[in-house]
């Protein structure tokens, strides 16, 4: 009898060891699908709520409102009425994939309300019932097994709602219901359906996803694995998770997709396209929480956002979407933006954020696209390449519409209606690089300057040299050598937009025409939405006067007219400045002799010299040089000639980030910085 008892005890111990060994292995979705008994025990039993799962769920709830504020695609503060059949009224989510997406986003929005202590629906039992009922309704309609390379319903292109948003619904509903009687059911449904629709961190419905899509998929996948009892360490070793962690690591790359050494985000190989980054940014907090602070290049990503964004959500259009926008509803929540000037010397982006305004310019380089078109968006190339303006941070944000998107400050118009198409010749996206693209940037403590030489073959060989200076409360802009393909304008004069007014928005500003009449028939000083424009005369340049025009009833413009004859000979000029309303300055600009040298002084300690290919910027005791040719050595003759041109020939200086090299100075490190910095010592 004792021997039999001992044998039985050994069998029990052996069974426990085998079970423990199996439970430590990564999820096997094939065996999950084949083994009904294992599926019932594993997917519909109570959640294995270990320490890591509990800690993650608690942290998720504590940070939900903050992270939700960083999420671009969402329904915030939903009030839509609930419906027993369709989850919400006036939707058809079981036949329309778009409506299904709306249901998903609305459920997540209600989860945020349920979780927010100050909300009237905080921990509402009725809302908790509605949330679990919504989850049940989704589960009742989803195909099991999932379709292969096809959306459960609707067009194949609508896979996104089922692969990206739906798993986030399962995760969010489950976590916010953790202290309710519904939690075990929600957790069981999440384990089951995520195993089907997210079998790995990078696959769904037969497709393998990468980049921004994989970033989104990885978080609910990892949560599903936590629910199954796996540790974060085990989850991190799975091949799909490893693949995603390599993506979110954002190592610096010299070319192609990812974060370039000067912290500009590149997508589609050569496009400054921040869309994926903006849509996925909120996930980085989850990855660092689950897998450690070092799994994400937080420093580089922070700089990438600072390089283009603002607290108000205004972003220079040249890094945004193909349909033309200057605004992100979430980027202002990503980082704490310092008052600073940022320059990306290799990717050619200059940004200034002051107390009073945000301004940025995207320059040109043959390494990167100046525009990306697709079959339905092909008219924003001028917006991406020529936006030259500031936005008053105390004024309202007015985004573009179909009537205004062609008429931004700085755009060189080749027709009266502003339409200039650069179409894709493929069925997908197509990027276009400049035929000539050379840019120098310089920044000091409060000022930034950018010198651009560009030619764009697809825009009638439009070419120009552009000189921009950002300084306290204002921006200076000069175009010279503006030209196009001869005889391409039908002998119609070109125009440069100085200031644009959206007439559908009431800002209490008078029309430009009324302001002109009230100012002795002069448009100098015309204002809209907190920004004032002025013509800037320059010695030895024929700078056009400011004129007013209304291309349609929806938009009114202050412009400078440039003759088609001058554009045909690449000799057209335009020059203006923009100031924050309520501020003025004593800015002056001079052409030195008849050379290609322009000296600009603000009268308040900032001086810029645009001496193509060299750019110099001086502020107080700091002086910076950069070459549009990206030279690694600045000759002493360039420095001395620049100081003479700004009437300070006797300046003594010491190198800061460069060293004496023959008859010039060589940069210490040119990996991401191409600006030569000097300190004035007398």
Swiss-Prot record:
GO terms under cellular component: membrane; viral envelope; virion membrane
Gene3D superfamilies xref list: 2.60.40.4340, Baculovirus E66 occlusion-derived virus envelope protein, domain 2, Chondroitin AC/alginate lyase
Subcellular location: Virion membrane
InterPro entries, alphabetized: Baculo_ODV-E66_core (IPR043082), Chondroitin_lyas (IPR008929), Lyase_8_alpha_N (IPR012970), ODV-E66_C_baculovirus (IPR006934)
Coiled-coil ranges from the UniProt annotation: none
Keyword tags: Membrane, Viral envelope protein, Virion
Function as written in the Swiss-Prot or TrEMBL entry: Component of the polyhedra envelope.
Family: Belongs to the baculoviridae E66 family.
Protein name in the entry: Occlusion-derived virus envelope protein E66
Source organism of this protein record: Orgyia pseudotsugata multicapsid polyhedrosis virus
Lineage of the organism: Viruses, Viruses incertae sedis, Naldaviricetes, Lefavirales, Baculoviridae
